[in-house]
Amino acid sequence: MTLIKSISGIRGLIDKSLNPSMIARYAQAFSLVSPNHGKILLARDTRNSGKEYIKISISALERISRKSIVVDIVPTPTAQFEVFSKGYAGGIVFTASHNPSNWNGIKFIGPEAVSYTHLTLPTICSV
């Protein structure tokens, strides 16, 4: 059950190394390292698992009183632009880029539209 953690985010096999409980934990952990104001943007690529991951994230964020906004299917740069231009606290994008369809991944976006991963991944993964 491979889970790949790198500077570009987290990637894993759908429902195996990247399962619903992990998605919820990562969403909540990301919220904890994000600024306290503003919503967390949620986006995805065209993989079907992204729909479920967004629902899981909404629920997980609501449990800790964090609001989210869903932009659904958009490229990562569009999600980054939305985070920055709308003043959101950050963003979570479910995408696995070039990986096979049985994979998905998570990219974390900071409030200034840049990848948050190099700063936050150790904290997020320790939760």
Question: Where do the language-model regions lie?
Answer:
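General structural signal for secondary-structure boundaries
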Residues: 19, 75, 115-116
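Acidic/polar active-site rim loop that often engages polyanionic ligands
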Residues: 99-114
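An N-terminal, well-structured beta->alpha segment
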Residues: 1-64
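N-terminal small/polar loop signature for handling phosphorylated ligands or for N-terminal nucleophile
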Residues: 40-103
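A residue-level detector for conformationally permissive "hinge/kink" positions
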Residues: 1-4, 35, 83, 97, ...
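Generic structural "secondary-structure junction" signal
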Residues: 12-16, 76, 108-111
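Conserved small/polar residues in nucleotide/adenosyl-binding loops
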Residues: 117-122
